[in-house]
A protein has these predicted regions:
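Active-site cores of enzymes that catalyze phosphoryl transfer or operate on phosphate-rich substrates
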Residues: 163-185, 256-317, 322, 614-615, ...
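Extended, charge-enriched "interface" segments that sit outside catalytic cores
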Residues: 4, 44-206, 223
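Alpha-helix capping and helix-loop boundary segments enriched in small/acidic/polar residues
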Residues: 7-10, 57, 198-205, 288-299, ...
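Subset of Sec-pathway N-terminal targeting signals
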Residues: 1-40
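Cofactor-binding active-site loop characterized by glycine-rich and histidine/acidic residues
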Residues: 224-397, 596-649
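Conserved phosphate-handling catalytic cores of large alpha/beta enzymes
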Residues: 371-382, 390-426, 430-436, 444
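Active-site pocket-lining segments that scaffold enzyme catalytic pockets across diverse folds
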Residues: 184, 188-248, 550-557, 564-578, ...
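Flexible, glycine-rich loop/tail regions that form catalytic "lids" or insertion modules at the edges
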Residues: 61-71, 78-108, 113, 125-128, ...
Length: 917
């Protein structure tokens, strides 16, 4: 980003003089960098009273060299900062030497500072001052920022020094007390619970006062809530000293003293995964604090925390970028995971997108210089652990974890930047890990030299205390007294806890709660007609694509012709919920149009490109808002974001849609660690809806299966709902049921692709205006002759319509749709089975291979439903390694085989059993 010719340092005085003469004859004949250089030199000549600057090429060379050196200090100064508390020398950079720029230290004194834009002194004075700024305590990387205003802000702020000032006497004492608490807690836990894992903060203790400063600065800038995400390292200290968890609560986690639990919902989690909510007073302002719970899957909490922050900003009034200061997100990373885990850049990529931005996140890397047993040389391909962030134009501040002054100054600078530009900012805190990966691990096995240094190195509290002693602020005796005061306090709390009898877990355990009745989901026909009319109104002069206009116009009559398709039913469901005051948010790849062009929630003017979102124009007197966004091409980060949003906004209907259901497994950690187990582990609740296009239509092994079997395998304790609606009306009702339920679980919906416009699957207005969602749908076509049915076939949506289209008239086969697979509708299925007195067998038919789909899950359920009195048969694809055929002809043949086998007459040799087996 130099403002001077990059090559002047290698040119001799004569060349510079020749170039200057050419510039004087015709400024356009030389490069702009030379023109700027000569303008500066001429200004210098005027200030010094010299004759034309070209008459003194040596002065030109010195000025150019000084300017280039100053530019290099801003650019490379971070490489000269002493960052490692253990003493590793900084690498430096040859560009930081005057000689590299064709000038000596002595010659710097020949250049007036005024020639470089400074008021007094010489270039030597300027260079000395800037070395103190950029090569001193904070290593700043900012020249990669594309926005010149941001670069100039950092230059001005760093060089003026208001935000990087040293701590005051009171602040230094407060930091000493804080570091004493942080260090004292870890030492006490090591003694009281020797051998327990706690993933201590020791070596980067300064993280706690840094977060303290971020909360204070955020509050002063208008924040009223702080949302945090972090891994296990240092979490116990953050829980107690930042979030406000009492020492008694923390000791209870070590002692196994659980709080109130219910018999059917809580298995709990280890203490260093726990979330927490607290608050803190900053002056007269109360700041809400929330630490998101997280699994051991490093960095996967990042998008979850971002989604929570976005939801809180929306609820606090933030919309379209307004009031983003109300919620400050803070994300704590590890030095090995930050460059190693793909979810990190995925989440950074969300930071500037309209559907996901949160007005900037404060990122802090807790840099231990080792990942478990892996050295940085094997952990990353970059110099700094933080380097991936630079690709997203995130400024980076590097600090030494033993220098609390620098660390807190970096926080001031970072929060001020975030407040000014509403962008992400990162602080890399270089420290060490006093113990192994956990306290039972021996790190000297793999890092013997490093841990010899660690063993000899004083703790951050000792380093800071010694500094204050050397400055005459406190005495050694006072430092020791502060330490003893805290040790006595925490010991007394521990003994008091030990003396308090533990309540019986059985006494605390409450009875399992019964599921609440389903809410009414039908909507009056007049209301649906009104919504439909509004959704088909365009702004004056708006030009819709002619083909799309015809498609949407069909929706005007569909309510009366019985042709409501999938996208239409969804729009009516969303519209009715908005009128009920329920916010709706949907995102996913191509979600605005829909992968299969079935939604068109956002329409585009073909002449101007202006967009119109009909659902966003519905009357909002009760507060319902509609958001829909095309997501970036990411599953893990976007699903994680929407999950986090759903936990923070529990009354909103939040949906994530996969482009194809096959791609949902890219986000498997979000499903396994959060969606399916959050309530059991952390008592956290989410009503997130996953829309997963699923169905075998010849698309091959990557465009057929949403891996239904994996979701069913995760189901237990009513932790989620897994459904496969067979009609638009069913889809309408289950969406409304999900939004209106008082106690929601995540909803996983298989979306039948080929049914989106299938006439046989269309719904009528009456289907939406009456009734509700049906878990199981009996075969109405055989209702008047059930006694003639020999084979009862249970299946899901897509399979049902394939069978229905091929079933001959008078067949003795009944087709029953199971639209809700979990919770399994056992009573309803058993009731249907009982209505067919002459059954000879029950078939589960599916498109998926036998080792996939629902078969393994439903087989034991069907044995219960039939009382083990009927033969249960499987018909579908055989067990396979790949979910579907890659050739369309093979697909068609297999599909025909399945249909034919299902619809064959039931074998007469198999009779209904007369007793249970």
């Amino acid at each position: 980003m130099s403002t001077f010719p990059p090559t002047t340092t290698v040119f001799n005085d004569g060349y510079i003089a020749e170039t200057y003469e050419a510039y004087r004859r015709d400024p356009s004949s030389v490069d702009e960098s030379w023109r700027q250089f000569f303008r500066t030199a001429e200004s210098l000549a005027g200030i010094t009273g010299a004759t034309p600057a070209g008459s003194d090429p040596a002065l030109l060379r010195k000025t150019a060299g000084a300017a280039a050196l100053i530019d290099a200090i801003r650019h490379y100064g971070h490489l000269a900062v002493q960052l490692d508390p253990l003493g590793t020398k900084p690498p430096g950079a040859v560009e930081l030497t005057p000689e590299f720029h064709g000038i000596t230290e002595q010659e710097l004194a020949d250049v007036p500072a005024s020639a470089l834009g400074y008021q007094s002194g010489t270039a030597a004075d300027v260079v000395r001052a800037l070395r103190g700024v950029y090569c001193g305590k904070i290593g700043l990387e900012f020249v990669h920022l594309g926005n010149e205003e941001e670069r100039l802000w950092f230059r001005r702020t760093m060089e003026e020094g208001a935000l990087t000032r040293p701590l005051s006497l009171d602040e230094k004492l407060a930091v000493l007390r804080r570091l004493t608490e942080v260090d004292g807690l870890e030492r006490f836990l090591q003694r009281a619970y020797l051998g327990y894992k706690r993933f201590s903060i020791e070596g980067t203790d300064v993280l706690v006062p840094m977060i303290d400063e971020a909360i204070t600065r955020g509050a002063q800038g208008g924040a009223r809530q702080v949302v945090m995400g972090m891994a296990h390292r240092g979490r116990l200290n953050v829980l107690t000293h930042v979030m406000g968890m009492s020492y008694v609560e923390m000791f209870g986690e070590f002692e196994g003293r659980q709080g109130e639990t219910s018999a059917d919902s809580s298995t709990g989690d280890v203490k260093y995964h726990l979330g927490y909510e607290g608050e803190r007073k900053v002056g007269a302002t109360t700041i809400k604090l929330e630490l998101a719970p997280n699994p051991s899957h490093l960095e996967v909490v990042n998008p979850v925390m971002s989604g929570m922050a976005r939801a809180y900003q929306r609820m606090a009034g933030a919309q379209d970028g307004r009031n983003e200061r109300l919620v400050l997100p803070i994300c704590i990373h590890g030095d090995a995971a930050f460059p190693g885990e793909g979810v990190v850049p995925e989440t950074f990529n969300l930071s500037r997108l309209r559907g996901y931005r949160v007005g900037g996140t404060l990122h802090i890397i807790v840099n231990n210089q080792v990942g478990f047993t892996t050295d940085p040389i094997d952990a990353r391909s970059t110099h700094y652990a933080s380097d991936p962030a630079k690709g997203f134009e995130v400024p980076v501040l590097h600090v030494n974890a033993d220098d609390a002054d620098a660390c807190i100054a970096a926080v001031r600078l970072a929060v001020a930047y975030r407040d000014q530009f509403a962008q992400d900012v990162l602080i890399d805190v270089v420290g060490y890990r006093r113990w192994g990966h956990n306290e039972t691990d021996e790190p000297a096995f793999t890092q013997p030299k490093l841990y010899e240094l660690v063993k000899q190195h004083p703790t951050p509290r000792q380093v800071w205390g010694a500094r204050l002693v050397s400055e005459g602020i406190v005495s050694d005796a006072q430092v020791a007294a502060i330490d003893k005061e805290f040790a006595d306090k925490i010991t007394a709390v521990y003994h008091e806890m030990k003396a308090t009898p533990e309540e019986s877990t059985d006494a605390q355990r409450s009875a399992p709660s019964a599921p609440a009745p389903d809410p009414a989901t039908a909507v009056q026909g007049e209301t649906l007609e009104s919504i439909n009319t509004r959704l088909l109104e365009w702004p004056q002069g708006f030009k819709v694509h002619s083909r799309l206009a015809k498609t949407l116009e069909r929706r005007r009559d569909a309510l009366h012709t019985g042709a409501i398709d999938w996208g239409h039913a969804e729009a009516l469901a969303f519209g009715s919920l908005l009128l009920d005051g329920i916010n709706v948010r949907l995102s996913g790849q191509d979600a605005e149009r829909g992968t299969f062009a079935h939604r068109h929630a956002v329409v585009h003017d073909v002449e101007t490109g202006v967009t119109h979102t009909p659902l966003a124009t519905l009357p909002q007197s009760r507060g319902g808002t509609f958001e829909i966004y095309n997501s970036p091409l990411s599953e893990t980060a976007v699903m994680g974001f929407e999950y986090g949003f759903s936990t923070a906004a529990p009354r909103d209907l939040v949906l994530w849609e996969a482009q194809y259901g096959d791609f949902v497994n890219v986000a498997q950690p979000i499903i396994d660690q959060f969606i399916s187990a959050d309530r059991a582990k952390w008592g956290q609740r989410s009503g997130l809806v996953l829309l997963l296009p699923h169905g075998y239509e010849g698309g091959g092994p990557e465009h057929s299966s949403a891996r239904l079997e994996r979701f069913l395998q995760l189901c237990a304790e009513r932790n989620m709902v897994v459904a496969y609606p067979s009609t638009p009306g069913q889809y309408f009702h289950i969406l409304r049921r999900q939004a209106l339920r008082a106690d929601r679980q995540p909803l996983v919906l298989m979306q039948p692709k080929s049914l989106l416009r299938l006439p046989a699957a269309a719904s009528r207005l009456e289907d939406l205006a009456n009734g509700g969602f049906l878990s199981v749908i009996d075969d109405a076509a055989v209702a008047d002759h059930r006694d003639e049915v020999r084979r009862l076939v249970l299946c899901t949506a897509k399979m049902y319509y394939d069978l229905l289209a091929s079933r001959p008239a008078g067949a003795d086969v009944a087709l029953v749709r199971v639209d809700e697979l979990y919770p399994w509708p056992g009573d309803a299925v058993a009731e249907i089975v009982d209505q067919y007195p002459n059954l000879e067998d029950v078939v589960w038919a599916q498109e998926e291979p036998k080792n996939m789909g629902a078969w393994s899950y439903v087989a034991p359920q069907l044995r219960v439903a039939t009382g083990n009195m009927l033969t249960i048969r499987y018909i579908g694809r055989p067990e396979r390694a790949s979910p579907a055929e890659g050739y369309s002809k093979a697909h068609e043949e297999e599909q025909k085989r399945i249909v034919a086998e299902v619809l064959n007459p039931a074998p007469t040799s198999a009779k209904r059993k007369t007793s249970k087996v």
